[in-house]
């Protein structure tokens, strides 16, 4: 196993957030192989080095790769919300490892969230270099005609730059509304809502159904499941990593 910075190791082992782990180190509460470390630059090999916090040994957590179907009206954050709104932590209480969401969905947006304690994979999923497509179902006000759909495919200038979907299609009409499937590989804030709103079609409901090769499928709202080895192999490959299946003991 490769060496990692001590603060990253402590964070991924579920001891504390990376920032709080740095505080523990600076306070002299962390030992590596029996010696107190106070430098944030120290690296450890989790398979060889013995790491302790306040005299208690710290063991690396097994890597977890989970997808959650986030319902509407949940904040994409761990811990309690200061204003009392529900957070996704309430939905993953039965996961013993400390996992974190990869990216976020707005409070009113539903659908696919990836959660993991694999920092390298998370960083690559979010990095624009890998251009992982995110697929959404958007229910918008009004009927989108073919002329407007063609204009949408050509893109439009928004306040933070030009935006053009990788793909967009009409799924069906629902009364006076239109259900669209729209794909972006960018991760700009409120991009889908702002893009469709620029064409005069306000988003009434938004749901993410895929991130790269990972699809939400029939997972019920508020439920989570582990990614299987086939899905993990595809996801790792999509971001330039090699997936090595965990050996069963």
From Swiss-Prot:
Q: Say which family it is in.
A: Belongs to the pseudouridine synthase RsuA family.
List the catalysed reactions: a uridine in RNA = a pseudouridine in RNA
Q: CDD domains per the record?
A: PseudoU_synth_RsuA_like, S4
InterPro entries reported for this sequence: PsdUridine_s_RsuA/RluB/E/F_cat, PsdUridine_synth_cat_dom_sf, PsdUridine_synth_RsuA/RluA, PsdUridine_synth_RsuA/RluB/E/F, PsdUridine_synth_RsuA/RluB_CS, RsuA_PseudoU_synthase, S4_RNA-bd, S4_RNA-bd_sf
Q: Which residues form the S4 RNA-binding domain?
A: 4-71
Q: Which GO terms describe its molecular function?
A: RNA binding; rRNA pseudouridine synthase activity
- Give the first-level EC class, as a single word: isomerase
Name of protein: Uncharacterized RNA pseudouridine synthase aq_1464
Alphabetical list of NCBIfam families matching this protein: pseudouridine synthase
Stretches that traverse the bilayer: none
Q: Which keywords accompany this UniProt record?
A: Isomerase, RNA-binding
Q: Which catalytic residues are annotated?
A: 106
Which Enzyme Commission number(s) are listed? 5.4.99.-
**GO annotation terms (biological process):** enzyme-directed rRNA pseudouridine synthesis
Its ancestry begins with:
Bacteria, Pseudomonadati, Aquificota, Aquificia, Aquificales
